[in-house]
Amino acid sequence: MFPWGLSCLSVLGAAGTALLCAGLLLSLAQHLWTLRWMLSRDRASTLPLPKGSMGWPFFGETLHWLVQGSRFHSSRRERYGTVFKTHLLGRPVIRVSGAENVRTILLGEHRLVRSQWPQSAHILLGSHTLLGAVGEPHRRRRKVLARVFSRAALERYVPRLQGALRHEVRSWCAAGGPVSVYDASKALTFRMAARILLGLRLDEAQCATLARTFEQLVENLFSLPLDVPFSGLRKGIRARDQLHRHLEGAISEKLHEDKAAEPGDALDLIIHSARELGHEPSMQELKESAVELLFAAFFTTASASTSLVLLLLQHPAAIAKIREELVAQGLGRACGCAPGAAGGSEGPPPDCGCEPDLSLAALGRLRYVDCVVKEVLRLLPPVSGGYRTALRTFELDGYQIPKGWSVMYSIRDTHETAAVYRSPPEGFDPERFGAAREDSRGASSRFHYIPFGGGARSCLGQELAQAVLQLLAVELVRTARWELATPAFPAMQTVPIVHPVDGLRLFFHPLTPSVAGNGLCL
């Protein structure tokens, strides 16, 4: 018995020694890893690196970030301040929030920082896109795309967008069961982008097939840049090539159309604008531009649309105020055509043919609707931030940002900490954007509200996105009422795009026109 006891003690002692050695090695490795990044500071600058942790060797804090989501950034902001360092996805990162700090980053494009996209995104989207362009090519392409989102172009888009949104809301009411709003919004935004922006002639089956192919491309956009069988990049390349093959036929038709004809959609405008600048766009350029437009409109607009539906459901007082404003503007009456019978097997009813009653001018008069849309984008911005790479070492808030390091500016954190609004930033308060509080915001509020970024890379399609959300709000409020199909509101996932974890499952019910004809009743 005694020898057996000694044997057990020996095993335990050996195990303890092994664990102690492993712990010491891990501690030493972490210390050396931290030292390695401390020594990477620019010694020509007397400023220190920002506070923060570089995590574990090679992995950095990536695992913490993936598990904690938005809490990862907020906890470190509380601990280290509005500028801190970390290590994510294999790169050293400086996380930045706060209006003044973000202003420095956004206005420093081409001078202090440049846009940063993963290599896989460059491979899949191509070399002729605005996202990957820098310097003069970026300015030239931005000038061409600016016409796609000009006021004249938006005037042409709005009636067709309203028709698509009206049809969609009526189909939700006719569904006869719960609707996954996020999934439905993704399908809707793809259809609108493909048919209205790009002018593609697609039936429902073709649109659904192309949407699935496009979603496969987007899902693999941020993958390891390894083109090997079964890799994410290989799947993305296959999806991209399928999209390009489909687009090629439609683009060929446009290239051979009458050059003097008035452009009718975004692809027409891109072709005409390039020709006016003395450049004949190639087929490859146009295919990549078309995919980029789809990418820009897809997830972000679907995310914002879902957030709009969610926040209105949580705040019925806002619905009542929107309804009052619509009645005051003579827009309270919805399309009087009854949607298809609930639960019918025929699917969504055909378009009723009612004339669109909204224009950019009419939307401009809906001040409270505009405030609601802005508040949705402030509280739940679709994208949490943007990435840049430091072109040279520069100062930010008393710290050095070393050349070559990644810089991530945070949209969400900046909105959450903005002090220019009278009401608490965590609450839903559309009135914060009303005229009554305009003086309290002042000119300094420009970089406190940045759902579309800012500077040289601000979103060109922001007015179109806001118009889509305004149109959706109007059609929802005067057409339907909606309620949860689940016991409680879903949690929100924030990485990579803000969306409810369950897709937001809701029941939609049609409203009936009031007898008076100037309002709506249940």
UniProtKB/Swiss-Prot annotation:
Membrane topology: Single-pass membrane protein
Known catalytic reactions: an organic molecule + reduced [NADPH--hemoprotein reductase] + O2 = an alcohol + oxidized [NADPH--hemoprotein reductase] + H2O + H(+); all-trans-retinoate + reduced [NADPH--hemoprotein reductase] + O2 = all-trans-4-hydroxyretinoate + oxidized [NADPH--hemoprotein reductase] + H2O + H(+); all-trans-4-hydroxyretinoate + reduced [NADPH--hemoprotein reductase] + O2 = all-trans-4-oxoretinoate + oxidized [NADPH--hemoprotein reductase] + 2 H2O + H(+); 9-cis-retinoate + reduced [NADPH--hemoprotein reductase] + O2 = 9-cis-4-hydroxyretinoate + oxidized [NADPH--hemoprotein reductase] + H2O + H(+)
EC number from the UniProt entry: 1.14.14.1
Induction record: By retinoic acid.
Gene3D superfamilies membership: Cytochrome P450
GO cellular component term of the entry, any: endoplasmic reticulum membrane
CDD domains (alphabetical): CYP26C1
Keywords: Disease variant, Ectodermal dysplasia, Heme, Iron, Lipid metabolism, Membrane, Metal-binding, Monooxygenase, Oxidoreductase, Transmembrane, Transmembrane helix
Amino-acid positions noted as binding heme in the UniProt annotation, renumbered to this chain: 459
Transmembrane portions of the chain: 9-29
Pfam families: p450 (PF00067)
Cross-referenced SUPFAM superfamilies: Cytochrome P450 (SSF48264)
Family statement: Belongs to the cytochrome P450 family.
Record protein name field: Cytochrome P450 26C1
